[in-house]
Amino acid sequence: MATGKEIRGKIKNFESTKKITKAMEMISVSKMRKAQERMRAARPYADKVRNIAANLGQANPEYIHAFMKTNEAPVVGMIVVTTDKGLCGGLNTNVLRSVTNKLRDLQSAGMSAQTVAIGNKGFGFLNRIGAKVVSHVTQLGDKPHLERLIGPVKVLLDAYARGEISAVYLSYTKFINTMKQEVVLEQLLPLSAARMQAETEASETASGAKHGWDYIYEPDAQSVIDDLLVRYVEALVYQSVAENMASEHAARMVAMKAATDNAGNVIGELKLVYNKTRQAAITKELSEIVSGAAAIGA
């Protein structure tokens, strides 16, 4: 049985751990709020670009952008968004499990995959399983910049525009609320004109504002479509990173709260054991004193 001194040492260690996890929980709360603001701020831009591109495409049905064409190549691109750090529960595990299942399905269908890793955890995992990583970006910090994302992602976008890959998928964790995040594996390319138009109409219905799109575009509508669709895809990737960061801090906050609560429970149990050990020691000493006094009296 552990001595009182050993138990006191364990209690002290767990109290130190509890302070650390509590501090990390509070930091995650602050970072999560900022990440949520950044995530919400990015949505209107992507929506507006999509609306303009969708209506331009509807007005010019004869023009089909490279991102809307269907390629027959036996190669698929995949953008995997994970975190740079751990201690966020099963967030990365769930995303990487989804990616692994997709890669397995592609292999069964006789197709290969080229991946782009955003985040250190995904980059390390993809290398370990032998996936082909054509580009990556890590250490984005708490404020991701689009400029750092464009280069790695452009590798797949250019390959799709050249017809070298048949589709591009995007995998990340979508932020629902503080307690719930969902893994998303969605097709990024080819873009669907019908889907973009449906989302535009839904957005306009929700906002109650119908727009007139009788504009004059310079130098011409096709050049504007080319630029807007690239910006739209980049905005979707940025939005996924912002969603993933909000999910990361929410998951870390929950994980650290659970760790703090568990540390508190262990401390309570150790204090109970310590008190019982101390009580047993005191009882033993009293018994020895009483026995000694009885022996002297006899």
Swiss-Prot record:
GO terms for cellular component: plasma membrane; proton-transporting ATP synthase complex. Keywords: ATP synthesis, Cell inner membrane, Cell membrane, CF(1), Hydrogen ion transport, Ion transport, Membrane, Transport. Its main location: membrane. GO terms for biological process: proton motive force-driven plasma membrane ATP synthesis. It is a peripheral membrane protein. It is found in: Cell inner membrane. One of its GO terms (molecular function) is ATP binding. HAMAP family: ATP_synth_gamma_bact (MF_00815). F-type ATPases have 2 components, CF(1) - the catalytic core - and CF(0) - the membrane proton channel. CF(1) has five subunits: alpha(3), beta(3), gamma(1), delta(1), epsilon(1). CF(0) has three main subunits: a, b and c. Produces ATP from ADP in the presence of a proton gradient across the membrane. The gamma chain is believed to be important in regulating ATPase activity and the flow of protons through the CF(0) complex. Belongs to the ATPase gamma chain family. This is ATP synthase gamma chain. It comes from Albidiferax ferrireducens (strain ATCC BAA-621 / DSM 15236 / T118). The gene is atpG.
